[in-house]
């Protein structure tokens, strides 16, 4: 992701970084700082095959691990992820996972990216409009430009704002409601 190096010099990033540093000092913010860029550390640019775009990290204690929709071993599977597993089971007969840890997906080339990379404890969408959207939009632009035949899965209204920056002549785009909205019988 060296193509993003220039982003870290831009005004929005400097302002965003300052806001995030202050938030970590004064509030409980997820994920913890060491996991903030886990999506990028887990799935290198040249290995990306699928990009799943979510909203923001889980805001419950111990849930967010820096991968969209993922939680660590031993954490109860959140309803949105359980709905994803149920859809995979219903459509493809894939057994419902006992763990919500999606690190194996990331290791296989699935970039699990939220449009907003941080959130305040128990306050969903609390870091919306701080500047993360500018950064994640740039990430998608780089992937769309540099790679080919990537499957982009856009879940929820917040994720769909990037639809227009993906080159649909080179990539595949799947848009749907947020998995939390899915109803299973």
Which stretches of residues belong to each language-model region?
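A polyanion-binding, active-site-adjacent surface
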Residues: 6-154, 158-161, 166-168, 172-177
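Extended, histidine- and acidic-residue-enriched regions that form the cofactor-binding/catalytic faces
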Residues: 179-181
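Generic N-terminal amphipathic, Lys/Arg-enriched alpha-helix
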Residues: 1-4
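Conserved small/polar residues in nucleotide/adenosyl-binding loops
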Residues: 183-185
């Amino acid at each position: 992701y060296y193509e993003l190096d220039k982003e870290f010099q831009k005004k929005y990033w400097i302002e965003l970084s300052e806001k995030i540093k202050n938030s970590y000092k004064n509030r409980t913010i997820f994920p913890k700082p060491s996991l903030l860029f886990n999506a990028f550390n887990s799935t290198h640019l040249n290995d990306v095959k699928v990009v799943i775009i979510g909203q923001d990290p889980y805001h419950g204690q111990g849930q967010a691990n820096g991968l969209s929709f993922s939680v660590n071993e031993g954490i109860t599977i959140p309803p949105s992820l359980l709905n994803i597993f149920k859809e995979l089971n219903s459509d493809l007969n894939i057994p419902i996972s006992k763990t919500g840890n999606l690190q194996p997906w990331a290791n296989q080339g699935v970039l699990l990216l939220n449009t907003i990379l941080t959130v305040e404890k128990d306050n969903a969408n609390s870091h919306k409009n701080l500047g993360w959207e500018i950064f994640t939009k740039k990430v998608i632009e780089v992937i769309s430009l540099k790679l080919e035949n990537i499957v982009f899965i856009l879940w929820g209204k917040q994720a769909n704002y990037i639809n227009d920056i993906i080159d649909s002549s080179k990539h595949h785009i799947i848009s749907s409601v947020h998995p939390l909205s899915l109803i299973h019988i």
